[in-house]
Swiss-Prot record:
<comment type="function">
    <text>Has antifungal activity against A.flavus and F.oxysporum.</text>
</comment>
<keyword id="KW-0611">Plant defense</keyword>
<dbReference type="GO" id="GO:0031640">
    <property type="term" value="P:killing of cells of another organism"/>
</dbReference>
<protein>
    <recommendedName>
        <fullName>Amaryllin</fullName>
    </recommendedName>
</protein>
<keyword id="KW-0295">Fungicide</keyword>
<keyword id="KW-0929">Antimicrobial</keyword>
<dbReference type="GO" id="GO:0050832">
    <property type="term" value="P:defense response to fungus"/>
</dbReference>
Length: 15
């Protein structure tokens, strides 16, 4: 499975 870019960004830097 592949994580979407938006999810990756949110996962790395949750705001």
């Amino acid at each position: 499975q592949k994580i979407q870019e938006i999810d990756l960004q949110t996962y790395l830097q949750p705001q």
